[in-house]
A protein has these predicted regions:
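Active-site/binding-pocket entry motifs
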Residues: 65, 83-84, 238, 250-251
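Low-complexity, glycine/alanine/valine/leucine- and proline-rich hydrophobic stretches
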Residues: 249, 262-271
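Hydrophobic, helix-prone linear segments
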Residues: 1-82
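Vicinal oxygen chelate
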Residues: 1-2, 8-11, 32-36, 57, ...
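Short, flexible, glycine-rich and Lys/Arg-enriched loop motifs at helix boundaries
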Residues: 37-52, 85, 204-223, 252, ...
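Eukaryotic phosphotyrosine signaling hubs
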Residues: 6, 98-102, 174, 264-267
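Long, charged/polar, surface-exposed segments that mediate recognition or autoinhibition
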Residues: 89-96, 262
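Amphipathic alpha-helical segments
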Residues: 15-30, 116-119, 182-198
Length: 323
């Protein structure tokens, strides 16, 4: 099934304004206040019946020469009213598993952006740091905002990303990381059940980064901890979509059960496909289980869509829609 790059990451929050303001003022996002989500979205997200409304705001990255103004790679901030909530990945440790760990963006001036975010109360797993991994040479910081939101900001030296805003304004979301305990099951899910394309796989051993500052692993364990990594992209998409990481030597808590609505954190990723109903049937034909069956609903500002979702073996919700 032909799929476009990440359309948006849906982020559940306690307070929309608290997360939106620094993303707008520092990172260059443009906001659109949306109508509340319709009743069909409540059902698709398995929202408890006591929820009275789903408030929404869309944050779209500023266009650049590298990334035109097509609305992709956006952040949809949602607030569930009238229900009890907790943070999905509560302690934010990079060796905990379950759900969606972060979303990834490019910046031409990572340090400027991160230092400005710190003035809004943001922190990070560690300091911005240069490192090389596989064919990539980058500078990176994994920034931590409010409400369980983790944002990996990447300044890529090689291969260089041409046409980014020179002041550091963030690119669209192009990738998202999931920390898993069963690497083989996650690889089968994305590679076989969803038929995503495996872009690369590698093992990380006997290096400090990405570990000490990127993931907050304490020394000497940052060097000693063996990690497996795989990057998948949907068929037809020009950019990567899902990065899987397993830490073989450091083990934390599993947060799978908490990574659902109306809890707070990165709720799901959304991808546009040619034919959502047909893709759902393909997934079921390969033995996959749907989290939400295809439904027709209005998703502002996209319009009337057919949408369904799946849930990975460790609780990451992935939505697919077609216009």
């Amino acid at each position: 099934m032909q799929t476009k790059p990440v359309q948006e990451a849906v982020v559940s929050v306690f307070d929309i304004e608290r997360l939106a303001r620094p993303l707008i003022e520092v990172c260059g996002y443009v906001e659109t206040v949306l109508p509340d989500a319709p009743s069909e979205q409540f059902a698709a997200w398995h929202v408890p019946s006591e929820c009275t409304r789903i408030e929404q705001r869309l944050l779209v990255p500023s266009p650049s020469e590298a990334f035109p103004a097509d609305g992709r790679g956006a952040l949809r901030l949602v607030r569930f009213h009238g229900v009890e909530q907790k943070v999905m990945r509560s302690s934010q440790r990079s060796w905990d598993t379950g759900g969606i760990f972060d979303v990834d963006v490019f910046s031409a001036d990572l340090d400027r952006v991160y230092r400005a975010l710190q003035r809004h109360g943001w922190t990070a797993m560690g300091e911005p740091v240069d490192y090389s991994e596989a064919m990539f040479s980058v500078r990176q910081v994994v920034a931590i905002g409010p409400d369980g939101f983790v944002l990996a900001i990447i300044q890529r030296y090689e291969p260089f990303v041409e046409g980014l805003d020179p002041t550091g304004l963030l690119s669209p979301v192009f990738n998202s990381t999931q920390v898993v305990s069963d690497f083989d099951a996650a690889v089968r899910f994305y590679g076989e059940t969803l038929d995503f394309e495996l872009q690369m796989t590698c093992k990380i051993e006997d290096v400090v980064e990405p570990g000490a500052d990127v993931l907050g692993l304490p020394l000497p364990h940052a060097r000693d901890a063996r990690r497996e990594l795989a990057i998948f992209k949907p068929q037809g998409a020009s950019e990567g979509g899902i990065e899987l990481v397993r830490n073989l030597d450091m083990h934390g808590k599993r947060w799978d059960a908490e990574c659902i609505a109306p809890n707070v954190g990165i709720l799901c990723l959304r991808f546009e496909v040619d034919d959502a109903a047909a893709y759902a049937a393909e997934i079921e034909g390969r033995g996959g289980v749907l989290y939400a069956r295809p439904v027709t609903l209005e998703v502002a500002p996209l319009g009337i869509v057919t949408l369904f979702s799946v849930r990975s073996p460790e609780g990451a919700i992935i939505e697919f829609y077609s216009l």
